[in-house]
């Protein structure tokens, strides 16, 4: 009789990366935090990083992704209730973000570097779950717009910035309509004076993210034109029609809503709603940039960890030249995105308005556009294991296009940059002055800077290429000034000399081993 044999032993599989400290493992973030003025937040980041890389946090994230939100429009008696049911793990994740003041830190503690520290916290916690950061971002971003109405700010800002999930409040936005999309001036929702200084708003919104928010900023037409209003989610005229069945961020309820005589309170000047709400939009665009950089970082960490523990054809993947090329290319893309996100966040601390507005628009376009390609290549580094839901890589890939669509898709973002050169002529010179700080540090960057033309004279047809060239100039400048020579050299070689059609096409001579070693400090 044959002896019993096992079908197989589990060999040559990478061990789980968790538990690990997301912050401590990220040398690039640690350096950027210090460089951009947020060094005082190290302990806060280390504490958040430990939780973000814990098995507990990862399990909560996986659970709320499996148990998607569900809308109950009516109770058993037929009464309208519009209740969104969310998994307890969603509340756990959101509570952690609120208690760590990711939604409010710069407004509660406006010292130098607070936007950088807050951006770093956003970057770390986004690696746990991207969907949960949407209400966090909107609440953070609503404050500058709300301050256009001092009485409303006095009433709501204390609650919106409170680091308490139970006693605080969350803010959302509702701008997009069926017929207009990003063209909010085509909105048909209208607001009529109610006779008490407020307005009655009637209409619809095609996208309203996180309808459980306590308050929303929205746009509606008045006799003076498009205006910005604050509405409350508890208003009986605020009706959730359905939840969106989306490609990604499936833990996050996004909805269609109707306003049936909802009470609205004017924010800013009547007829100047776009000018008012853009104060919110600029901050959410910053968070789109941070979120995409965070996704790149998470994908890179998974790819490098896998390659360090997986062997093929007699060698670890991380020791094989072509895999080193791919990993190094992913690493320089991630480092450039992280460095840029933190530099732009510093501009919010410094109130450097011309650079801040222009750089936010440029880098939101570029980094968010690069994220899906980066996610796909990181997934492929894990082979078939990366194609399986349990790895988390499919979720990363599904989530990655969102930030390029939110707050203006690629074309809208690129055209905004061109318009900014005309409407805010000080923006481009401020941006170029930052790029020029690296002049003389690398001949390839110098040549790239010389090639950049006057955007105000270029047609819309070339907008994406032009804005991409600007983005690469800033990224290369930051790396030449601040990154190790191996990183800066590889980036300039791959991004400024016409190569890099796919990740993993770095030219010969780059120090891929050094770059990959730097990528994950565990």
Q: Where do the protein language model's features map onto the residues?
A:
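Internal helix-loop-helix
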Residues: 78-168, 208-210, 334, 399, ...
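A glycine-rich, basic-preceded beta-loop-alpha segment at the flavin cofactor/substrate interface
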Residues: 256-284, 301-318, 425, 448-460
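Flexible, small-/acidic-enriched active-site or ligand-binding loops
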Residues: 237-261
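A short core secondary-structure module
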Residues: 198, 202-238
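Extended, charge-enriched "interface" segments that sit outside catalytic cores
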Residues: 1-111
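C-terminal amphipathic alpha-helical interaction region
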Residues: 424, 437-522
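C-terminal helix-coil-helix/basic helical segment that borders enzyme active sites and/or dimer interfaces
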Residues: 335-366, 379-380, 453-463, 467
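C-terminal catalytic subdomain
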Residues: 396, 400-439, 467-475, 483
């Amino acid at each position: 009789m044959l002896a019993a044999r096992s079908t197989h032993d589990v060999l040559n599989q990478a061990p789980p990366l968790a538990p690990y400290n997301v912050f401590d493992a990220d040398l690039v973030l640690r350096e950027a935090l210090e460089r951009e003025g947020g060094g005082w937040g190290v302990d806060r980041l280390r504490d958040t990083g430990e939780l973000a890389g814990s098995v507990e946090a990862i399990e909560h994230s996986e659970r709320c992704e499996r148990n998607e939100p569900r809308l109950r429009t009516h109770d058993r008696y037929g009464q309208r209730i519009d209740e969104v049911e969310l998994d307890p793990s969603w509340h756990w994740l959101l509570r952690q973000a609120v208690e760590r003041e990711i939604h409010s830190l710069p407004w509660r503690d406006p010292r130098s570097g607070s936007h950088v520290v807050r951006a770093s916290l956003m970057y770390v916690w986004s690696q746990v779950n991207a969907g949960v950061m949407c209400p966090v971002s909107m609440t953070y971003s609503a404050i500058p717009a709300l301050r256009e109405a001092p009485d409303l700010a006095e009433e709501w800002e204390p609650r919106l910035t409170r680091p308490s999930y139970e006693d605080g409040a969350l803010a959302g936005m509702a701008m997009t309509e069926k017929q207009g999309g990003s063209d909010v001036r085509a909105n048909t929702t209208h607001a009529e004076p109610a006779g008490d200084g407020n307005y009655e708003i009637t209409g619809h919104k095609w996208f309203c993210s996180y309808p459980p928010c306590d308050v929303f900023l929205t746009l509606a037409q008045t006799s003076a034109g498009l205006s910005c209003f604050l509405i409350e989610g508890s208003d009986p005229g605020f009706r959730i029609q359905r939840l969106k069945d989306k490609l990604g961020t499936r833990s996050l309820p996004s909805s269609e809503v109707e306003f049936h005589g909802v009470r609205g309170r004017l924010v800013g000047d009547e007829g100047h709603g776009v000018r008012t709400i853009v104060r919110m939009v600029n901050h959410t665009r910053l968070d789109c940039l941070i979120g995409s950089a965070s996704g790149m970082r998470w994908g890179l960490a998974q790819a490098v960890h896998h390659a360090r523990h997986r062997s093929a054809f007699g060698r670890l993947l991380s020791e094989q030249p072509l895999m080193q090329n791919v990993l190094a290319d992913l690493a320089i893309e991630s480092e450039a995105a992280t460095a840029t996100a933190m530099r732009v966040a510093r501009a919010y601390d410094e109130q450097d308005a011309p650079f801040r507005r222009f750089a936010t628009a440029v880098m939101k376009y570029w980094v968010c556009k690069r994220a899906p390609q980066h996610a796909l290549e990181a997934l492929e580094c894990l082979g078939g294991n990366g194609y399986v839901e349990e790895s988390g890589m499919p979720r990363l890939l599904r989530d990655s296009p969102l930030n390029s669509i939110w707050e203006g898709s690629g074309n809208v973002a690129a055209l905004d940059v061109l318009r900014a050169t005309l409407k805010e002529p000080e923006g481009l010179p401020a941006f170029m002055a930052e790029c020029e700080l690296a002049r003389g540090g690398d001949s390839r960057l110098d040549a790239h800077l010389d090639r950049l033309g006057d955007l105000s004279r270029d047609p819309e047809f070339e907008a994406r290429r032009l804005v991409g060239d600007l983005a690469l100039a800033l990224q290369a400048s930051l790396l030449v000034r601040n990154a190790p020579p191996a990183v800066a050299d590889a980036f300039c070689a791959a991004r400024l000399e016409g190569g890099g059609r796919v990740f993993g096409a770095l030219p010969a001579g780059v120090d891929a081993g050094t770059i990959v070693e730097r990528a994950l400090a565990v």
